[in-house]
Amino acid sequence: MVQAPVARPMTFEAFLEWYPDDGRRYELIEGVVVEMLPTGPHENIGGFLGAELNFEIRRSKLPYSIPRTCLIKPQAEGSGYMPDVVVLNRELLKQEPCWPAASVIQYGATSPLVIEVVSTHWRDDCGHKFVEYEAMGIAEYWLVDFRALGAVRHIGQPKQPTITICQLESEEYQMRRFVVGEKLISGVFPHLDLTADAVFAAAGSC
């Protein structure tokens, strides 16, 4: 992850106008533009999860779609996030003011699930994004820590590859951890047949 020098904090609107068409991924974190530089294994997992969820969407005939890229505009000023996987409710996209012109959502109901594959900058995934997705009312947030990078308070002891599924209940996330040998349980995809083992194996050689 590379942080671009800025003279003053950037607004989300300025970030959206600035965003270059260079094939790279950028996020805005507290007014600072950050280039995301995911590893190959990181991208493998994101692609695998997107494919698995797309299959489940078709199989269960759900009104969802997964865009190739999508920016999430949280309530906090000066921030904009690009999760590894964003599941959108197609029926609610009409309420998104930016959607006709840009792949941007700002209402939590539009995205029932977002997934972040944890990187070396796990504090953003477990900190800023956790708080902001919760405040937006995004029903489910997955943290896929396939390299066990997060703090013990997030992934438990002993540290091991962990998928934390955060489900919104009474406006607060309730967290459940899944490790090797366990099947994932999702409220958004109740019939999903997916294990933590399969997700971690998708990374390939790390």
Segments (PLM) and residue ranges:
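Gly/Pro/Ser/Thr-rich low-complexity, intrinsically disordered segments predominantly at protein N-termini
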Residues: M1-C206
